[in-house]
């Protein structure tokens, strides 16, 4: 076991604080509409330029083990806030640094760390309750656009695009962000249910120019297993031919004799048909086929439930107004499913999302939910260079997360103003002087985000904060982008409650742990042993050679 180095008391806390300061000072320059950029070196490719706090925090690793512990604990504040709210990482870092700095000073002055922690917790609880009380629910598309614009560092076109996407696919719909191949940023909305499987044979194409197969008012056969035997498929094919409607077959695979017969029938014009593979794999495939069945009012043909293919009748097939199939994707538009059944399925998936602990499973469940509930919107982020695209994509991701958080818990005045007001409204009393000191630590720390936003804009922070506090209106604050004071909610300078609340709660949680730290243990740095010197006379076996 490697030897360990141990630090105690004041020395331990000072080393922690040094690490906290290094990370926070690198992150906090990005805060606000006039925040600066941070350039991150990459071992290959161009350096990355970002104004995203958590991206900066994740890149910082310090040489000194004890300082690094402080930096990593503060990084946890940013990461946790990003996981919960998807934005507010820089605010959380600034709050965390402010609480730790004040707390370490208080402990050095002889105060009881545990009482300080109790005071900090009591103050944070009251501030969070105050934020919920002041929160304003957002209803309109314009308000959603405002939240997106603020989180995208003032880029109005990003805010508007996110508002448009949310309007089209609903709050339950999936909005994904991808890098575009062009310089333009654009929004694409896919209506209905789309899955990433295309036609099994190009002979199914109905529009040779676009290479797509369009089926109007088709029957949909949903089969769990492979289809290779033609005989079992014949009864259902004959029934569909007599109905005069097109047919879409969704199965694990269609091959051999069955596929050849379908293609021949399509080419002869006897049957308008297309076949695609079922989406997903394993249990997820079963669940997605069930989703398609509910959406189209059909049944999954599976021997597990005792239905054989040769016994299938037309009323077991799904229906939709239109199906569009390209080489890569199949889109089912306006399925004939019952609204009550679709709602029940949506609620079932929501319950699974609540229960799952896996991020991957949650993402896949949310995709399924969107396909059933509304649709999918894709924001393709473009730019002149790869570096610009990556930086812009970070901002779009932040803006998207912030708008979702705003819809969930409402909004408060932005620019750090809500926390400033909450500091003034703190009335909770501590049980002793040390707890009172903990409450005062939070009261002072709540000013830090507003001060940092002003500092990054080149303003005198104390003057700006003083002027804001002179006016008692809750929403009165400073618009850093224009340099004017006014009603921030009316000006569209807003923050989601979920973002502000998560930032404060996570900052206080980690800061309390750092303040109550009394000992630190780290591995001693390994001493590199020098290579032994080469023996005299060079390499063996070289004697007697003439040069």
From Swiss-Prot:
GO CC terms of this entry: cytoplasm
The cellular location(s) given in this protein's UniProt record come to: Cytoplasm
What reaction does this enzyme carry out catalytically? ATP + H2O + a folded polypeptide = ADP + phosphate + an unfolded polypeptide
Task: Supply the InterPro entries for this chain.
Answer: Chaperonin_Cpn60_CS, Cpn60/GroEL, Cpn60/GroEL/TCP-1, GroEL-like_apical_dom_sf, GROEL-like_equatorial_sf, TCP-1-like_intermed_sf
Sorted alphabetically, the Gene Ontology BP terms of this entry are: protein refolding
Annotated keywords? ATP-binding, Chaperone, Cytoplasm, Isomerase, Nucleotide-binding
A Pfam family for this UniProt protein? Cpn60_TCP1
Q: Any idea which positions bind ATP?
A: 30-33, 51, 87-91, 415, 495
Enzyme Commission code: 5.6.1.7
Q: Which GO molecular function terms does the record list?
A: ATP binding; ATP-dependent protein folding chaperone; isomerase activity; unfolded protein binding
Q: What does the UniProt function comment say about this protein?
A: Together with its co-chaperonin GroES, plays an essential role in assisting protein folding. The GroEL-GroES system forms a nano-cage that allows encapsulation of the non-native substrate proteins and provides a physical environment optimized to promote and accelerate protein folding.
The record's comment on protein family reads: Belongs to the chaperonin (HSP60) family.
Q: Which HAMAP family match?
A: CH60
Query: Which NCBIfam families does this entry report, sorted A to Z?
Result: GroEL, PRK00013.1, PRK12849.1, PRK12850.1, PRK12851.1
Tell me, how does this one assemble? Forms a cylinder of 14 subunits composed of two heptameric rings stacked back-to-back. Interacts with the co-chaperonin GroES.
Q: What is this protein called?
A: Chaperonin GroEL
Q: Which organism is it from?
A: Bartonella tribocorum (strain CIP 105476 / IBS 506)
Task: Specify the taxonomic lineage.
Answer: Bacteria, Pseudomonadati, Pseudomonadota, Alphaproteobacteria, Hyphomicrobiales
Gene name, Swiss-Prot/TrEMBL: groEL
